[in-house]
């Protein structure tokens, strides 16, 4: 059974720049005007990452555009947003992030079946330049393979 996801924003650069070792889902604390802006698809998580502050996890650099029909008390576009996770998950994440070279990256933001905004996070390790070149070669080879199969 496939799970319903209405994708709002994706971070395609994260897959290119990092080895994603583990994926997890988290809720996010939002204001009303932010939700309305997300329904219009006006969000970007290209440069966003998550970090811990004690025993909470926040999402940084996530851009949600201002909702044009909101009043003068609109939200700030790049404010840190709290992620909703279970305590065991937070402890596990903090343990993994504290290891040198690991980071917590936002991979996608979407509405789930109950119309709640969720963020897919990935515990990731940065790629070196030669790893990025290998992934480019692999992507080109897959593209060439599909062309050869179509020609036959």
Curated annotation (Swiss-Prot):
GO terms for biological process: trans-translation. It comes from the Bacteria. The keyword Zinc does not apply. The keyword 4Fe-4S does not apply. GO terms for molecular function: RNA binding. Keywords: Cytoplasm, RNA-binding. It is found in: Cytoplasm. Disulfide bonds: none annotated. Gene3D superfamilies: 2.40.280.10. GO terms for cellular component: cytosol. NCBIfam families: PRK05422.1, smpB. Required for rescue of stalled ribosomes mediated by trans-translation. Binds to transfer-messenger RNA (tmRNA), required for stable association of tmRNA with ribosomes. tmRNA and SmpB together mimic tRNA shape, replacing the anticodon stem-loop with SmpB. tmRNA is encoded by the ssrA gene; the 2 termini fold to resemble tRNA(Ala) and it encodes a 'tag peptide', a short internal open reading frame. During trans-translation Ala-aminoacylated tmRNA acts like a tRNA, entering the A-site of stalled ribosomes, displacing the stalled mRNA. HAMAP family: SmpB. Belongs to the SmpB family. This is SsrA-binding protein. The gene is smpB.
């Amino acid at each position: 059974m496939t799970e319903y996801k209405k994708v709002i924003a994706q971070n395609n650069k994260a897959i290119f720049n990092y080895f994603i070792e583990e994926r997890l889902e988290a809720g996010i604390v939002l204001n009303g005007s932010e939700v309305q802006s997300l329904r219009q698809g006006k969000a970007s998580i290209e440069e966003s990452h998550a970090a811990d502050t004690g025993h909470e996890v926040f999402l940084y650099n996530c851009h949600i555009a201002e909702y044009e029909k909101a009043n003068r008390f609109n939200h700030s576009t790049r404010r840190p947003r709290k992620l909703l996770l279970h305590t065991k998950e937070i402890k596990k994440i903090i343990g993994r992030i504290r290891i040198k070279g690991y980071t917590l990256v936002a991979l996608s933001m979407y509405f789930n079946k109950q119309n709640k905004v969720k963020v897919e996070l990935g515990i990731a390790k940065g790629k070196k330049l030669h790893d990025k070149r290998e992934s480019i070669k692999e992507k080109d080879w897959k593209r060439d393979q599909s062309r050869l199969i179509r020609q036959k």
